[in-house]
């Protein structure tokens, strides 16, 4: 039998599967909408955590949950569809008790187990992280270069990219390397995408030469 707390979170999740306006209005809407099953669970959790002022705590706990579920000894029985649900719940209860997770995180895990959605856990964690990133005003930016950028170049690039942000927004920069682009860089910031790689320039030159042949 589901606990009252689990049932409450379950009701919030279900209301996102319907078009009933009144229950939807009672939820605290996240700053960004994430679609799909994972998005519905994450939105319900965001609403509950926001009302209790525990967004940061839940975010930290969810990252720990994702880490735990990557451990083979845990993932094998918990994510195996042929293992009885009661065994999964017992294993999860042991984990949540050991980690001393908050009731919000514990209830989410129990709800996912109850609904046979444990395989969606990583997706829920990712969706919640996306909401929290938007909550903090973070703008994700990925810079891909053929080789690691020098600190001076990276610092100058950050200054340029920050000039495109609105007030209150925070740049969250991730630098990656991909030798296949040959040189230059590829920048993705928010919804914008700029390809300044040597590889793309060569491809454009090749197409142009074929068209004029």
Curated annotation (Swiss-Prot):
Keywords of the record: Acetylation, ATP synthesis, Hydrogen ion transport, Ion transport, Membrane, Mitochondrion, Mitochondrion inner membrane, Transit peptide, Transport, Ubl conjugation
Any single Gene Ontology cellular-component annotation: proton-transporting ATP synthase complex
Modified positions (N6-succinyllysine) in chain numbering: 90, 158, 162, 199
Highest taxon in the source lineage: Eukaryota
Transit peptide per record: 1-23
Subcellular location: Mitochondrion; Mitochondrion inner membrane
UniProt keyword annotation of Acetylation present: yes
Post-translational modification summary for this protein: Acetylation at Lys-162 decreases ATP production. Deacetylated by SIRT3.
Residue numbers carrying N6-acetyllysine: 54, 60, 70, 73, 158, 162, 172, 176, 192
Matches recorded under InterPro entries: ATP_synth_OSCP/delta_N_sf, ATPase_OSCP/d_CS, ATPase_OSCP/dsu
Signal peptide per UniProt: none
Gene3D superfamilies on file: N-terminal domain of the delta subunit of the F1F0-ATP synthase (1.10.520.20)
GO terms, molecular function: proton-transporting ATP synthase activity, rotational mechanism
Entry-linked Pfam families: OSCP
Positions of short motif SIFI-degron: 5-23
Function: Subunit OSCP, of the mitochondrial membrane ATP synthase complex (F(1)F(0) ATP synthase or Complex V) that produces ATP from ADP in the presence of a proton gradient across the membrane which is generated by electron transport complexes of the respiratory chain. ATP synthase complex consist of a soluble F(1) head domain - the catalytic core - and a membrane F(1) domain - the membrane proton channel. These two domains are linked by a central stalk rotating inside the F(1) region and a stationary peripheral stalk.
Matching PANTHER family: ATP SYNTHASE DELTA CHAIN
Subunit and interaction comment: Component of the ATP synthase complex composed at least of ATP5F1A/subunit alpha, ATP5F1B/subunit beta, ATP5MC1/subunit c (homooctomer), MT-ATP6/subunit a, MT-ATP8/subunit 8, ATP5ME/subunit e, ATP5MF/subunit f, ATP5MG/subunit g, ATP5MK/subunit k, ATP5MJ/subunit j, ATP5F1C/subunit gamma, ATP5F1D/subunit delta, ATP5F1E/subunit epsilon, ATP5PF/subunit F6, ATP5PB/subunit b, ATP5PD/subunit d, ATP5PO/subunit OSCP.
Family as reported in the entry's similarity comment: Belongs to the ATPase delta chain family.
Record-given protein name: ATP synthase peripheral stalk subunit OSCP, mitochondrial
Native organism: Pongo abelii (Sumatran orangutan)
Protein encoded by which gene: ATP5PO
